[in-house]
């Protein structure tokens, strides 16, 4: 025989006992607030309290909760839920209840809080979208009414029409707001000399002057009036022409000021002559690879009408590279046959020399260059220097040779594996022999390695050096603590880490306003 109301009656009695302080065997402290409760109820509803009372039941009369995570109102709400089975958020933030439930491992409450937060986010997004749509609609109505008022001012008014007829030409903002679906206006059909879309002329207005036009006819009349206004407004074109000329003159003044400031730097920099004149006597030099590679640079310099400079210590490098290329061409014309070795050396030298003209373009802002310590060649980046150094080592060392046979290398006699020293070889030999030289003095258990023995010794000393900072539970091994955190506190740790990163990182707006502006004006 079952009593369906027994569980509800039991919870009601326990809740009354808690409020009276009758048979309460524990005290929960959250900051300065104290809560009297029963251990059995707390351990039944929260996995945190279940683990807390599992180890030492007699010595856990007072429980301290982390007040940074669990607030007193949130814990009071969860305590009421434990005894009554009802969750009433009232005016409490859902985030506080979620943090407290995660801390106490009350996963049903966590699911409810997450669902409420999701619904709250969706409702806020919908409300903001509706506000944006309403504001955009009102802006369109205002712009349409302003444009219609301007057009009404430009319309030729007849002397026979009265003020009442003029007021009825355009609708007011109140009428437009009252009828948001009808986004059209009332316009007089005074286009006697303008043909319609079908080729027919629109008749004149009646004496009253009140004609209602459909949306299509209103848009057609608007387009026709705009065409006629563009044709008749010659003065507006002149004004636009003057504005363009003034803007161009401003750009010319800016360019002149820029080049005048660049003249000051000519005393400290060496000008590089990229483009050669046609009347130069050394016109044959312009046919080499250097000028062909820099043809694009010449075109960009001529089109942009700018002068390029480079540091003075790079000018001799360019001259040396040109001279080396000329010498290489002379040698190539003299030698008809080339061996594969000389061809490889020439290709490598050509690659290294071809990098030198680009030093000024690839240089870092600090103007650093990287020199090879073996051949004193200069390279624009450390990556290219590393590639160059690998060619030196490949030529000197060649393929890495194996150690000589007479050298004693620690080798395992069973599997043939080699090791760097005898200590690692001895450790490896224990895997074959099964030797366990390290023995525990308490229980006589043996181990292969010393660190395993030190880990085992903690079992006899009953020490628990590894403590969980979330629930204050202690463990003998670090691996047990890691598994405990992953099992019970994974969601809480992830949420707190995301919050801390969001608070510590600067915003993108602050970075762009401060750092980028300083870099630009340096």
From Swiss-Prot:
Instruction: Give all Phosphoserine modified positions.
Output: 157, 516-517
- Segments for region (Interaction with DNMT3A): 310-427
Segments of skewed composition (Basic and acidic residues) = 121-143
A cellular component annotation (GO) from this entry: nucleus
> Which processes are annotated in GO (biological process)?
cerebellum development; cerebral cortex development; hippocampus development; homeostasis of number of cells; in utero embryonic development; negative regulation of DNA-templated transcription; negative regulation of transcription by RNA polymerase II; neuron development
Location in the cell reads: Nucleus
Region (Disordered): which ranges?
121-166
Query: Which parts of the sequence are C2H2-type zinc fingers?
Result: 370-392, 410-432, 438-460, 466-489
Q: What GO molecular functions are on record for this protein?
A: sequence-specific DNA binding; zinc ion binding
Phenotypic effect of disruption: Death shortly after birth. Brain of mutant mice display dysplasia of the neocortex and of the hippocampus, reduction of the number of mature cortical neurons and defects of laminar organization. In the cortex, an impaired cell-division patterning during the late embryonic stage and an enhancement of apoptosis of the postmitotic neurons are observed.
UniProt keyword annotation of Zinc present: yes
Keywords in alphabetical order: Developmental protein, DNA-binding, Isopeptide bond, Metal-binding, Nucleus, Phosphoprotein, Repeat, Repressor, Transcription, Transcription regulation, Ubl conjugation, Zinc, Zinc-finger
Q: How does it assemble?
A: Interacts with DNMT3A.
Family statement: Belongs to the krueppel C2H2-type zinc-finger protein family. ZBTB18 subfamily.
Its job: Transcriptional repressor that plays a role in various developmental processes such as myogenesis and brain development. Specifically binds the consensus DNA sequence 5'-[AC]ACATCTG[GT][AC]-3' which contains the E box core, and acts by recruiting chromatin remodeling multiprotein complexes. Plays a key role in myogenesis by directly repressing the expression of ID2 and ID3, 2 inhibitors of skeletal myogenesis. Also involved in controlling cell division of progenitor cells and regulating the survival of postmitotic cortical neurons.
Name of the protein in its database record: Zinc finger and BTB domain-containing protein 18
- In its UniProt entry, the species of origin is given as Mus musculus
Q: Which gene specifies this protein's sequence?
A: Zbtb18
């Amino acid at each position: 025989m079952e009593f369906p109301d027994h569980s509800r009656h039991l919870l009601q009695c326990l809740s009354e006992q808690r409020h009276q302080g009758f048979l309460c065997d524990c005290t929960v402290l959250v900051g300065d607030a104290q809560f009297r409760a029963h251990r059995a109820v707390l351990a039944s509803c929260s996995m945190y309290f279940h683990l807390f009372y599992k180890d030492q039941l007699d010595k856990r009369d007072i429980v301290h909760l982390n007040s940074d995570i669990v607030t007193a109102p949130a814990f009071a709400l969860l305590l009421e839920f434990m005894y009554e089975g009802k969750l009433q958020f009232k005016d409490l933030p859902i985030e506080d209840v979620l943090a407290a439930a995660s801390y106490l491992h009350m996963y049903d409450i966590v699911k409810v809080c997450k669902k409420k937060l999701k619904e709250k986010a969706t409702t806020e997004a919908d409300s903001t979208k509706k506000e944006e749509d309403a504001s955009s609609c009102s802006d369109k109505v205002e712009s349409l009414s302003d444009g219609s008022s301007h057009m009404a001012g430009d319309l030729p008014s007849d002397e026979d029409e009265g003020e009442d007829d003029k007021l009825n030409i355009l609708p007011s903002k109140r009428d437009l707001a009252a009828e948001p679906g009808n986004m059209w206006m009332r316009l007089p059909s005074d286009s006697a000399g303008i043909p319609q879309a079908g080729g027919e002329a629109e008749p004149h207005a009646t004496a009253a002057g009140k004609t209602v036009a459909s949306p299509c006819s209103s848009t057609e009349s608007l387009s026709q009036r705009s065409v006629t206004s563009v044709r008749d407004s010659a003065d507006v074109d002149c004004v636009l022409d003057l504005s363009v000329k003034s803007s161009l003159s401003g750009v010319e003044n800016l360019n002149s000021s820029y080049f005048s400031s660049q003249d000051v730097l000519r005393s400290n920099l060496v000008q590089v002559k990229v483009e050669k004149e046609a009347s130069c006597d050394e016109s044959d030099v312009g046919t080499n690879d250097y000028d062909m590679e820099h043809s694009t640079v010449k075109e960009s310099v001529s089109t942009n009408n700018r002068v390029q400079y480079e540091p003075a210590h790079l000018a001799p490098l360019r001259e040396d590279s040109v001279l080396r290329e000329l010498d290489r061409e002379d040698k190539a014309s003299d030698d008809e046959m080339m061996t594969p070795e000389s061809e490889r050396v020439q290709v490598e030298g050509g690659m290294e020399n071809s990098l030198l003209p680009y030093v000024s373009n690839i240089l870092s802002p600090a103007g650093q260059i990287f020199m090879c310590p073996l051949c004193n060649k200069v390279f624009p980046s450390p990556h290219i220097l590393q590639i160059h150094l690998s060619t030196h080592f490949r030529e000197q060392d060649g393929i890495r040779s194996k150690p000589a046979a007479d050298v004693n290398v620690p080798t395992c006699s069973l599997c043939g594996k080699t090791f760097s020293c005898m200590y690692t070889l001895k450790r490896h030999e224990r895997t074959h022999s099964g030797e366990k030289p390290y023995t525990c003095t308490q229980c006589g258990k043996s181990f292969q390695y010393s660190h395993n023995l030190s880990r085992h010794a903690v079992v006899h000393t009953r020490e628990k050096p590894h403590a969980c900072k979330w629930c204050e539970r202690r463990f003998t091994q670090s691996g047990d603590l890691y598994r405990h955190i992953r099992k019970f506190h994974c969601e809480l740790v992830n949420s707190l880490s995301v919050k801390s990163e969001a608070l510590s990182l600067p915003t993108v707006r602050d970075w762009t306003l401060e750092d980028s502006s300083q870099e630009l004006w340096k």
